[in-house]
Amino acid sequence: MKDKIWLKNYPDGVNSLANINEYNSFTEFLDDGFKNYSDLVAFENMGKTITYKELNTLSKNFSLYLTEELKLKKGDRLIIQSPNVLQYPIALFAALRSGIVVVNTNPLYTQNEIQHQFKY
C-alpha cells in the first residue's frame, strides 16, 4: 500500500481515517458532518463565507426544488457548469442528497464532449 502523503498536511487532531461503517448512506455521512461542524466555515469565496449550517439549509432547499419542482429523481443526471463559487457546493450537495448524479462540465467543452456528458 502506498503512503498517503497528503496526511502530513493535516492539522493536529484531524482523524486521517473515516469509519465508513458508522453510516448507512452517504447522506447520513453528510448530515453528520453538517451537524458536527455547523458553526464552522465550510467554504469561502470572493470574501464571502458559508457555514456548514447554511450549506445544509440551502442544499436541502435546493434539493426540494430539484425533486419537487423539476421532478428530478434518483439516478437522473444534473449537469453543473460553474466556476468555483459558493453556489457550486450548494448545487452539488443538493443533488447528492437527492440521489441525483452530478456531471461537471467545462465551458470550453466542444459540442461532442458535452453530448458525451449526457450519455448514461
Predicted segments, located by residue:
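Short glycine-/small-residue-rich flexible loop motifs, especially phosphate/cofactor-binding loops
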Residues: D31, L92, Q115
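Short, intrinsically disordered, charge-balanced linker/junction segments flanking boundaries
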Residues: I114-Y120
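N-lobe entry segment of adenylate-forming
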Residues: M1-I50, E54-E69, K74, S98, ...
